[in-house]
A protein has these predicted regions:
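Beta-rich ligand-recognition domains in immune and ubiquitin systems
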Residues: 1-168
């Protein structure tokens, strides 16, 4: 997996090799380029079948999330959530660990923030699962979803000074 800089929110800096993303104060108006309000970036490779997984190293502070998003989220012009803009993710926000979709937040209590997260996608089963990669322990699995034949992209959100996500 590599990050697609053309999908990066203006407040995010993607490394030249496409392996990491970090937060930086905006040099331009984020709404001017048709980006949503979320400081996120997508992976270059779209997934339409099979199983795949990737690991990321995350910072223990700040706010970040990792997961997958439908192709329709790739270039959205509006900031409101609709069923066409689905995502399945997990992350840290204000010290609380969450499982997040476009429509809901599920608090994950008694979870120690992992150093590395493994995202696992089974396209045919519609399954997205997250693991503590160091402990090889399951953190959360979303109920089966239908991806409706659309491409699914790795999705990364970084939201605060000092937050960074690096692909392993």
């Amino acid at each position: 997996v590599t990050l697609d800089p053309s999908t990066a929110h203006p407040q995010l800096v993607v490394s030249a090799d496409g392996r990491s993303v970090r937060w930086e104060e905006a040099q331009q108006d984020p709404s001017a380029k048709g980006f949503g309000t979320d400081p996120c970036v997508l992976g270059c490779q779209g997934i339409t079948s099979g199983r795949c997984c990737w690991e990321v190293e995350v910072t223990p502070k700040g706010s970040w999330a990792v997961g997958v998003a439908r192709e329709s989220l790739k270039r959205r012009e509006e900031t409101t959530v609709s069923p066409e803009m689905e995502l399945w993710s997990m992350g840290l926000c204000d010290g609380q660990f969450w499982a997040l979709t476009s429509l809901e937040r599920i608090p994950l209590y008694q979870i120690q923030v992992p150093r590395r997260v493994r995202v696992s996608l089974d396209y045919e089963k519609g399954q997205v699962a997250f693991f503590d990669a160091d402990k090889r322990a399951l953190i959360f699995t979303f109920p089966a979803a239908s991806f409706k034949g659309q491409q699914i992209h790795p999705w990364f959100l970084v939201w605060s000074e000092g937050s960074q996500i690096t692909l392993c």
